[in-house]
Amino acid sequence: MSRRALLRDGMLASGLMLGAPLLAACGKGNTAGPAKAGAMGAGSLRLLWVENVEFAGSYIADTNGYYKAEGFSSFTLISGGPTATPVETDLVAGKALFGISTPDLVASAVVRGGAGIKIIGAQFQKTPFALVSMADKPITTPQDMIGKKIGVQAISEPVWAAFLKANHINPNSVTKVPVQFDPLPLTTGVVDGWVGYITDEPIVLRSKGFKVVTFLFADHGYPLVGDAYVVSDKTIKEHRDAVKAFLHAQIRGWKEALADPALGARLAVEKYGKNLGLNVAVQTQESKTQNTLVLTDDTKKNGLFTMTPELIAENIAALKLGGINMTAGQIFDLSLLTEVYQENPSLV
């Protein structure tokens, strides 16, 4: 099932409910020293997708009580999925205090939907979008796609078009084959390549015995970040300490997820996604793979979720390739994360 199709279609269908009240009550202003128990009020995080290992750090933060340690009286992880409204809609409607989304979806909500929201950090320093091909007929660079048949789901077409543009490839030089959600056409030779997620199709195919090769779009001219943390402008203005407390808890959770990839996988399989029929081996491999998107040379130096000015500029340029023109200030506010690390240098 295409998560991006469901996410994008949901946004188009529901629209953005602007001006609704914020759901959770949080402490205002700046505080010094440890957070008082419950001072931040009730918190909630709307996940981008169903409760698989993608959100390992949040599961660990919740299980180990890091949200409460940062001053939240309670904290709820709200699942996404096939029937969920868009994250952006839930944020501006006050149904969730924090959310996880992608820059293109957030940018569209801001520019085309008028949403007052900002990205405050990036879980994945690189988008998981990847080109998957069979090992016996490998496609290892964008130029290798010329003359080939590439399976593209309908909802991935904007990303596909932007990726071709970034690599100066004439769309007519590649045969785009409309596909659904199952990558079976790749294994049977119907297509030569498949546009998917590095944390999804390749792992599933390998678990079934297929040998595949991949390359990330982010390594070839389309450097969007992924799983961005998003919050409303209203929350940033009125509950800044709560936002910083959330980021602090997330950092703690993800540090443990990086140290033990199997931990988040077990929590996904046995607790948070226990009704999804997840496979612990597949989830563990996904955890290991996604950790390479979380921990980079820059985040090792500057801290998890940070974005360098260069990376922000590259994201704005990539969004323009997809027809969304905006400035960095319209979509990014990394000042809260900067403050978290300034106040807690041991977190880096």
Q: Model-flagged regions — what are they?
A:
Residues M17, G33-V179, L184-T188, D192-G196, ...:
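Short, glycine-/small- and polar/acidic-enriched structural segments
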Residues G27-G29:
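Bacterial signal peptide processing site
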Residues K137, D182-G277:
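Pocket-lining segment of extracytoplasmic ligand-binding domains
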Residues H239-G322:
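Secondary-structure end/capping motifs
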Residues P309-V348:
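Conserved C-terminal helix/tail region of periplasmic/extracytoplasmic solute-binding proteins
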